[in-house]
């Protein structure tokens, strides 16, 4: 299989401790892997959106720490502890809205809390244990996504039992390029396609970064899934005219009450789906869900150049003011169901059911 056929956003070599990421800024015209040799490389790759998607951001951030750990030696546990905590705090600043990296950092912090009591003589063992936990995150993400795909396909088809094949609409990129593999919302679509239940997928271009046209369309063509690319402003008409059975999107952060932060444009799709009585689903692993819904969601704002330029070519007059939030928040009342690796839940029941499942 050639590099162009494999569609891996992240390549990690356990034996040699090497990490490569597919530079998604160059897709679909160029297919280039770049080395990530430590934490700063990981931070830059995330910040510059060479890698994106909440699950992939977390995995690349953590693996960049694992790569740097392999090249370092420590003699004192306090020195090791400080390095880990400082590194985690730095990685969290790369993209503030995507929650997965915050939760991954919390898991490593809790691990360190347990390891530090072992004393200086165990610092080598502690380093190995942190690397092992990080590598497990990579493998768990793929399996989690496949379960999301299966649960999501079942939920969507349950609402359209009389149809042999269905049309679905998706937004941004939530596939192999946004995760460790398979995808969340696009994983649901892959599962539907594997059941011979897809007639056509409509994907939005997703301005201003065009993750839909550059990345999702790329994945759909690669997989041979029948697909049609539309501009963001066409979504309402497509819902009216093209017999859409479901809208399924990913998430960068889901609160316990079901409110969901996702790529800008998700909110308006949810409103339009509600008007047309089309089920609207969020597909996200439990690592994207924050059961404490009292915390505010920080919405990242990005450079005006993402709106006023395309590949350095101006498309707007100099001096125009630009508002460029990367995400919006969809209220829970617009969401039909939240698809996770442990089941599909309505927003109102999600918190209590997840607490029961995750604490059992």
UniProtKB/Swiss-Prot annotation:
InterPro entries assigned to the protein according to its UniProt record, in alphabetical order: IF-2B-related (IPR000649), IF-M1Pi (IPR005251), IF_2B-like_C (IPR042529), Initiation_fac_2B_a/b/d (IPR011559), M1Pi_N (IPR027363), NagB/RpiA_transferase-like (IPR037171)
Known catalytic reactions: 5-(methylsulfanyl)-alpha-D-ribose 1-phosphate = 5-(methylsulfanyl)-D-ribulose 1-phosphate
Active-site residues from the entry: 252
Keyword field contains Amino-acid biosynthesis: yes
Entry's Gene Ontology BP terms: L-methionine salvage from methylthioadenosine
One of the record's GO cellular component terms: nucleus
Alphabetically ordered keywords of this record: Amino-acid biosynthesis, Cytoplasm, Isomerase, Methionine biosynthesis, Nucleus
Record-linked SUPFAM superfamilies: NagB/RpiA/CoA transferase-like (SSF100950)
Keyword Cytoplasm (UniProt): yes
E.C. code: 5.3.1.23
UniProt GO MF annotations: S-methyl-5-thioribose-1-phosphate isomerase activity
Pfam families in the record: IF-2B (PF01008)
Site entry: Transition state stabilizer: 172
Subcellular location: Cytoplasm; Nucleus
Job description of the protein: Catalyzes the interconversion of methylthioribose-1-phosphate (MTR-1-P) into methylthioribulose-1-phosphate (MTRu-1-P).
Family the entry assigns: Belongs to the eIF-2B alpha/beta/delta subunits family. MtnA subfamily.
PANTHER family documented for this protein: METHYLTHIORIBOSE-1-PHOSPHATE ISOMERASE
Protein name: Methylthioribose-1-phosphate isomerase
């Amino acid at each position: 299989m050639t590099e162009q056929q494999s569609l891996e956003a992240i390549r990690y070599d356990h034996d040699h401790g090497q990490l490569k990421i597919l530079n998604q800024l160059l897709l679909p015209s160029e297919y280039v892997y770049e080395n990530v040799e430590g934490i700063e490389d990981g931070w830059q790759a995330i910040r510059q959106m060479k890698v994106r998607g909440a699950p992939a951001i977390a995995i690349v951030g953590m693996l960049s720490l694992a790569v740097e750990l392999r090249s370092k030696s420590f003699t004192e546990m306090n020195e090791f502890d400080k390095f880990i905590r400082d590194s985690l705090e730095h990685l969290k600043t790369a993209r503030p809205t995507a929650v997965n990296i915050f939760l991954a950092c919390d898991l490593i912090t809790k691990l360190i809390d347990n390891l530090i009591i072992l004393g200086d003589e165990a610092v080598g063992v502690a380093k190995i244990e942190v690397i092992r936990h990080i590598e497990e995150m990579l493998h768990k993400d793929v399996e989690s996504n496949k379960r999301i795909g299966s649960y999501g396909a079942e939920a969507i088809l349950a609402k359209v039992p009389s149809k042999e094949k269905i049309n679905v609409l998706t937004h941004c990129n939530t596939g192999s390029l946004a995760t460790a593999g398979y995808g969340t919302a696009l994983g649901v679509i892959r599962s539907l396609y594997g059941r011979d239940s897809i007639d056509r997928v409509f994907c939005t271009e997703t301005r201003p970064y065009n993750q839909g046209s550059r990345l999702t369309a790329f994945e759909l063509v690669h997989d041979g899934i029948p697909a049609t690319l539309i501009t963001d402003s066409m979504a309402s008409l497509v819902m009216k005219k093209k017999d859409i059975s479901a809208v399924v999107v990913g998430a960068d952060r889901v609160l316990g009450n079901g409110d969901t932060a996702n790529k800008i444009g998700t909110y308006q799709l949810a409103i339009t789906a509600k008007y047309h009585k089309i089920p609207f689903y969020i597909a996200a692993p439990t690592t994207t869900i924050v059961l404490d819904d009292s915390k505010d969601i920080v919405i990242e704002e990005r450079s005006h150049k993402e709106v006023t330029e395309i590949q350095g070519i101006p498309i707007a007059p100099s001096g125009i003011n630009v508002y460029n939030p990367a995400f919006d928040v969809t209220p829970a009342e617009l969401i039909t169901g939240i698809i996770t690796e442990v089941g599909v839940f309505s927003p109102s029941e999600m918190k209590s059911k997840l607490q029961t499942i995750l604490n059992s």
